[in-house]
């Protein structure tokens, strides 16, 4: 039985993306269980600086965060993944509850179990959901102060307009008086950026190509995966890394009963990763309904963590 019955949005997004003149599939579909495993492996690669840089920042700013956030809050993590950096935050601020939200259910539950083992007294309440859509938080956190946690520069996977919408959406979920700790990858030389998304071991390539395997498996596709290659580009005008799946020969294939053709050199656009300077990330946060309180950057200015507060909402006169 095809698995697309359980996720019609995947089918809709893939078919729409393959039909268009500029083929593109939303990046969130890279993260099935296998994709999440591969991304976790990516974060440990020597070329992939964001994870180790952000981890070091979390370690160095623990005391300041504890003072600014305070104990007995509810930590809401958007796109929790393997939650490898989360214990650093939880250990620093002594929260009352932890609510990880992730689209990959099995991966989410495994990560939640690990956090629960590390913090036995903490209420851990995982939510399997797409955090870009409506999410209802557990009633148990309704009376608590809330800290949103969005590490890993995931905000960069969205175009600026969508980033603003997402930040406003997070503000709606977290509510008045909430705070947000969010990671931003900074603009830097391409000799650092490109290898982070095109590693020598080929793990990022496997992560990107896994999308085609997922389409074949879940949408009754027959895409010849070996005809495609991982392709990474730096778009200087947009200050972003772009990931594509480039076609190496003319191919014809079917997905969900629909026929498609691609020529040599055609590509499927699979992911953005926008990079920011300090001014740009602060403007983005303000546009999204958040007031920056403080930020933490490494010595190279490769990565920045920002602690922000929900800006007041003013009723129309």
PLM feature segments, named:
Residues 164-176:
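A short glycine-rich, Lys/Arg-flanked "PGG" loop and its adjoining helix->strand segment in the class I
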Residues 173-187:
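Conserved beta-strand signature within the Rossmann-like core of class I S-adenosyl-L-methionine
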Residues 1-29, 36:
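N-terminal auxiliary segments of SAM/dcSAM-dependent transferases
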Residues 104-106:
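Conserved SAM/SAH-binding beta-strand->alpha-helix loop
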Residues 22-69:
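Class I SAM-dependent methyltransferase Rossmann-like catalytic core
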Residues 72-81:
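Conserved class I S-adenosyl-L-methionine
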Residues 82-94:
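Conserved SAM-binding loop of SAM-dependent methyltransferases across substrates and taxa
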């Amino acid at each position: 039985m095809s698995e697309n019955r359980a996720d019609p949005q995947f089918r809709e997004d893939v078919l729409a993306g393959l039909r268009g003149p500029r083929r593109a599939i939303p990046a969130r579909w890279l993260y099935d269980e296998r994709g999440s495993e591969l991304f976790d492996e990516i974060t440990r690669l020597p070329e992939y600086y964001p994870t180790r840089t952000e981890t070091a920042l979390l370690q160095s700013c623990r005391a300041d965060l504890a003072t600014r956030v305070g104990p007995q809050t509810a930590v809401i993590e958007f796109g929790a993944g393997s939650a490898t950096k989360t214990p650093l935050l939880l250990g620093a601020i002594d929260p009352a509850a932890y609510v990880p939200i992730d689209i990959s259910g099995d991966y989410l539950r495994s990560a939640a179990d690990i956090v629960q083992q590390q913090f036995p007294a903490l209420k851990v309440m995982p939510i399997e959901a797409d955090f870009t859509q409506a999410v209802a938080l557990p009633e148990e956190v309704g009376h608590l102060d809330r800290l949103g946690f969005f590490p890993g520069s995931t905000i960069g996977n969205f175009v600026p307009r969508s980033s603003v919408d997402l930040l406003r959406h997070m503000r709606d979920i977290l509510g008045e008086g909430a705070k947000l700790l969010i990671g931003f990858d900074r603009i830097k030389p391409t000799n650092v950026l490109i290898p982070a998304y095109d590693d020598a071991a080929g793990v990022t390539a496997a992560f990107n190509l896994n999308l085609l395997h997922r389409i074949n498996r879940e949408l009754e596709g027959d895409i010849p995966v070996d005809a495609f290659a991982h392709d990474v580009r730096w778009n200087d005008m947009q200050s972003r890394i772009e990931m594509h799946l480039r076609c190496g020969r003319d191919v014809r294939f079917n997905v969900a009963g629909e026929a498609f053709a691609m020529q040599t050199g055609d590509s499927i656009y699979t992911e953005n990763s926008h990079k920011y300077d300090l001014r740009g990330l602060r403007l983005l946060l303000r546009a999204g309904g958040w007031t920056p309180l403080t930020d933490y950057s490494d010595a190279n200015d490769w990565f920045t963590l920002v602690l922000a507060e929900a800006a007041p909402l003013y009723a129309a006169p």
